[in-house]
Amino acid sequence: MLIYNTLTRRLQEFNEMHRGRVNLFVCGPTVQDHFHIGHARTYIFFDAVAKFLKLEGYSVFYLQNITDIDDKIINRAKEMGIEPSEVAKIYFSEFQEDMKRLKVDSVNFFARATLYIDEIVSQISRMMEKGYAYETDDGVYFEVRKFKDYGELSNQSLDQIIAGYRVAVNENKRNPEDFVLWKKKKAGEPSWPSPWGEGRPGWHIEDTAITETYFGDEYDIHGGGSDLIFPHHEAEIAQMRSISGKRYLAHYWIHTGMININKEKMSKSLKNFITIRDILKDYRPEDLRFAILNANYRTQIEFSKELMEESKKLIDYINDTYRKLEYVNGSGNFKIDVNSVISEMRSLAENDFDFHSVIVKLLAITGEINRNFEGINKEVAEELKKVYLWVDTFLGILEQKKEVSKGIVDDLVELRTRMRKEKNFLISDAIRDVLKKNGIHIEDRGDVTVWWQE
C-alpha cells in the first residue's frame, strides 16, 4: 500500500511499526461553534481510511483529540453568558451528533484536552529540563531555534521561518517565532495548577500529550487538514522529538485539502460558511460523503450546488441499481467476475487511498448491470451485491432504507398486472401511485413487471 507522506513529499510504501497494528491520530475540532463542511471533509476521509485499513486486515486504533479549552472557547463563553466548560460540552455533543449522521463512526476514542493536564505539565517540564522551553511572566514557551529540524514538515528552512516573524507581538518571548506551551492565569479564565503557577495549556501541546499517553513517543499515522501543517503540526513534531530524541513523531503524515465555495475560500467573513447541519437540510449524508470521497483528498474541492446535485444524482443511480438487484427475476447468463472486480478496487484504494478511482469503477459496473439487467439471474445478482457491500464498508454510500414487506408488494404488483391486462387502468394507475408514495419503483418490461425499493 502506498501513502503520500507530507513529511517526505513523496509516495511511500506503508510499513506499520507493529505487525498488523496501526495507530492513527487525527486532530479533532475546537468545540466552540457549529461544525462546517471543511470539518466534514477531513473526518469523512479519515473515517474511510480507518475503515479501509481494517478491511486490509489491520487492527486500527483511531484516536482523536477534542480541544475543550482555548481562547475561542473562552470568548464564545462570554458571548453566550455561560462557563467555557459548558460551551465545550454543548458543542462536543453537537459534533458527536453530526459525525453520527455522516456515518463517521470509526474513531475509537475522543480525548478531551482538559483531562490530560498532568500529562501536559509532564511534557513541558521535560522540555524545560532539556533546554527547549523557558518560563516568562505570562507563560512557558518553546524556543524554536533550539530545534534544528523545525520547518521540515512544511518544507521551510529555520531561517525562512525566523525571517517570517519580523515583529515581536509578545515582548515576553525571547524570539518572535517561539510558541506558547502554557498560559499563566488571567482573571476570569479557567486554570489548573502547574509548577509555573495556575494556568492552562497552549494549543499545540495537548496533541503530543494525548498521543504519548496512548501511543508512546512515536506512532504510525498523523492526519489533519492541510491548514494545520504549519504551525500546528510543525510544533507537535518539535515538542515530542525534543523530548524523545527520536527521528519521528509520526512515520506518515496525511493531509486533506481545503474547500472553496463557488471558487472562493470558505470563510465566515465572506459569508460563504456552510455548516454540516445546513447541508444536511437539503442533502443526504451519502450525498456529502460521495462529494468528498469522489475527489482526490489532497486537492481543493470546489464546493457548489452543482457538485451536490451531481453527487445526489449518482448516489441515486448507485442505490437504485443496488436495490434492483434485490428483486431481480431474470434468467439469462450474464456474469461478472466479482472477485476480480473487488481485487481491482482494492488495488486502486491501496494507491494512496484513491477512492475516486474506486467510485469510477463502481459506476462502470453499475452501468454494465443496468445495460444487461434482464440477463441477470438471482445467483449472479447476489454476487454483484457483494461489490456494493464491499465498497460501502469504507465509503459509506449505500443509503439505509426501511424494509418493506416483499409479500405485500408482490401481491400489489400482481394485482396491478392483472388490472392492466383487463385494461382497468384506473385501478392499475392507483396501485402504481400508492407504491410510488411508499418508495417502490416499478418498471414494465413487456409482460413482466419488476420492482425495487427506491
Swiss-Prot record:
Binding site for ATP: 268
Cofactor entry: Zn(2+)
Reactions listed under catalytic activity: tRNA(Cys) + L-cysteine + ATP = L-cysteinyl-tRNA(Cys) + AMP + diphosphate
UniProt-listed Gene3D superfamilies: Cysteine-tRNA ligase, C-terminal anti-codon recognition domain (1.20.120.1910), HUPs (3.40.50.620)
GO MF annotation list: ATP binding; cysteine-tRNA ligase activity; metal ion binding
SUPFAM superfamilies per record: Anticodon-binding domain of a subclass of class I aminoacyl-tRNA synthetases (SSF47323), Nucleotidylyl transferase (SSF52374)
Residues that, per the record, bind Zn(2+): 27, 207, 232, 236
Keyword Nucleotide-binding: yes
Gene Ontology biological process terms in this record: cysteinyl-tRNA aminoacylation
Subcellular location: Cytoplasm
Superkingdom field: Archaea
Enzyme Commission number: 6.1.1.16
Keywords, ordered alphabetically: Aminoacyl-tRNA synthetase, ATP-binding, Cytoplasm, Ligase, Metal-binding, Nucleotide-binding, Protein biosynthesis, Zinc
Short sequence motif 'HIGH' region: positions: 29-39
Motif 'KMSKS' region in this chain: 265-269
CC per GO annotation: cytoplasm
PANTHER family documented for this protein: CYSTEINE--TRNA LIGASE, CYTOPLASMIC (PTHR10890:SF3), CYSTEINYL-TRNA SYNTHETASE (PTHR10890)
Family: Belongs to the class-I aminoacyl-tRNA synthetase family.
Entries under HAMAP family matching the protein: Cys_tRNA_synth
The protein, known as: Cysteine--tRNA ligase
Taxonomy of the source species: Archaea, Methanobacteriati, Thermoplasmatota, Thermoplasmata, Thermoplasmatales
